[in-house]
């Protein structure tokens, strides 16, 4: 049997797209190659949000040159967001003639046809669709990893056009799946034994706007609440501008939607937020967080923060630090701005010097790490619901899972608890996780 290997860069959307690629390949008779096995086909699912990810892809393609020379029948494919960028597919063809297949984000369903062309002898098969205006394809197979959590894409694309972001150009405009299709998939996952679903989209808060029917993200969450077997519902990613008060209220009323709000703020300076085209002010963001906390005092709030956006001054950066102190995020994904060709920010004057970016990111990380540890320490003594996901290390006697705030909790327990929601009393706090003990009043036969 022929074997495949998929190498993934980037976000959860790419991870789930790779599950679809795997499903298609297995429907064609391929099986996944083990770590020590040589595959017959390698697909590299790429990301272009950061230059770092692109550099890693180029480095990998360079290393695969030797493997291709040793096995000329090996099929090497590049897919995902990178080839969707203007001129990138041709660049890959020229730099890496050993790449057999290049396709984008809109035509994954063509994979069998494209592989067939390679097998027939066509060189460097290229198929990039600049956009996709047709119906979403619901029939594609999915090969999910075993576990208790499953990703479910509810929409594709983004209409926001933040000035630094390449996503709308490579993922296209927003297009929502029907609520019926989402409901059916989640119900099927419940029947397969999954306990948690993570709803995916570049901006889930815009769900339904393009459907022409009276539905929105809050309504979708309310409908999924009724599916037996699913204990938890999460979602990503959200845009603060589109996060409605009704959505906050729906989450507060839900028993299954987790109280974790990931709301990328990006900057604390109104001047920079405007240049980024984020569509909200610092004050509006703070008001949203306050409303969330007023309804859900124990909510976990996390964020993304960028430093070094073009024109960012010391005063602008200090505004960001002040916001971090004010909100006290549970955690933050912090990163340095880098130029994405084709975006408005790439052409902006006053690009910030690299040494200044480095100083600022270090100061931000130091502050946020201090706050993150303090926020975790505040949870010591609490008894929390933890969905057990697996063993920490095989035979170690420790298992791990996530609480409703999406924080990892490590505690002593039997692997038979995987897939169950159990009460854990938090006894310790680290920067990246909590430690605890299984609550004394837990009875295995009563667990969910």
Curated annotation (Swiss-Prot):
Alphabetical list of CDD domains matching this protein: Radical_SAM
InterPro entries: Elp3/MiaA/NifB-like_rSAM (IPR006638), Methylthiotransferase (IPR005839), Methylthiotransferase_CS (IPR020612), Methylthiotransferase_N (IPR013848), Methylthiotransferase_N_sf (IPR038135), MiaB_methiolase (IPR006463), rSAM (IPR007197), rSAM_horseshoe (IPR023404)
All copies of domain Radical SAM core, residue ranges: 144-374
EC number: 2.8.4.3
Location of the protein in the cell: Cytoplasm
Amino-acid positions noted as binding [4Fe-4S] cluster 1 in the UniProt annotation, renumbered to this chain: 11, 47, 81
Cofactor(s) recorded in Swiss-Prot or TrEMBL: [4Fe-4S] cluster
A GO term from the CC aspect: cytosol
Residue span, MTTase N-terminal domain: 2-120
Cofactor binding, per record: Binds 2 [4Fe-4S] clusters. One cluster is coordinated with 3 cysteines and an exchangeable S-adenosyl-L-methionine.
Keywords tagged on the record: 4Fe-4S, Cytoplasm, Iron, Iron-sulfur, Metal-binding, S-adenosyl-L-methionine, Transferase, tRNA processing
Binding-site residues, [4Fe-4S] cluster 2: 158, 162, 165
Catalytic class of the enzyme: transferase
Pfam families (UniProt xref): Radical_SAM, TRAM, UPF0004
Chief site of localization: cytoplasm
Family: Belongs to the methylthiotransferase family. MiaB subfamily.
HAMAP family according to UniProt: tRNA_metthiotr_MiaB
NCBIfam families hit by this protein: miaB-methiolase, MiaB/RimO family radical SAM methylthiotransferase
Subunit-level organization: Monomer.
PANTHER family linked to this entry: CDK5 REGULATORY SUBUNIT-ASSOCIATED PROTEIN 1, MITOCHONDRIAL TRNA METHYLTHIOTRANSFERASE CDK5RAP1
Function, in words: Catalyzes the methylthiolation of N6-(dimethylallyl)adenosine (i(6)A), leading to the formation of 2-methylthio-N6-(dimethylallyl)adenosine (ms(2)i(6)A) at position 37 in tRNAs that read codons beginning with uridine.
Annotated protein name in UniProt: tRNA-2-methylthio-N(6)-dimethylallyladenosine synthase
Species of provenance: Pelotomaculum thermopropionicum (strain DSM 13744 / JCM 10971 / SI)
Phylogenetic lineage: Bacteria, Bacillati, Bacillota, Clostridia, Eubacteriales
